[in-house]
Amino acid sequence: MAAGFARSRQGIATVASLDQGVWAKTQADFGCHDFRDTDAGSMLRVKGSDTLAPVGPGVVTGWDFRNKGIRTLVNGIAKQDSTTAEMEWDMHYLVADIARTITLVPGDLLFSGTPAFSRPVQPGDIVEVEVEGLGRLTNHIVVGPTPIRTDVGAQPTESEEVISTAMGGDWEFRGIRTPSKDLYPSTVEEKE
């Protein structure tokens, strides 16, 4: 999910964080986790690369963020199925926490992240994110129009540790604790 702001917010209480002047959108939380080793401790390239933060299909005002269903489908199969009640920090808390030190201005978007059980996707996949009351956002995964340059900077990597971390493993135990594929079921049905 994404919260957007029609007026500035700074140093506000949690209870007032999502009062008037806030709107909501469905948001897909993509990441290019091949850059986790490149940006160790940072998510700049992992989450900030072009096209990784699609939002839509429209803007909803007066929407209550509490206890709403969130589902992610990949090629029509549910991969994530949760509610906002299961979020570690709800959107009210996230807005108030960020606004302690960063002034949120009109047009800013704050993303809540994704439910547990992230899954890798490949070119050709169709990813749909549904948020109760906000609608469905559909994304077609494609190869980017420009290859990543190899003559400058650290290059993307892929390893079991990177994949484990991307799917919810503990960063501080990378390379120490062997990743267990049993902890990361590939579908919602497998975890039940």
Q: Where do the language-model regions lie?
A:
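Short helix-loop capping/hinge motifs at secondary-structure junctions, enriched
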Residues: R9-A13, D64-F65
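N-terminal accessory regions of nucleic-acid-interacting proteins
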Residues: I12-A24
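Catalytic-pocket segment enriched in acidic/His residues
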Residues: H33-E192
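A short, gly/pro- and small-residue-rich
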Residues: W23-T26, I126
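Short, structured patches in soluble enzyme cores that scaffold and shape functional sites
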Residues: M1-R7, K25-F30, V59, V74
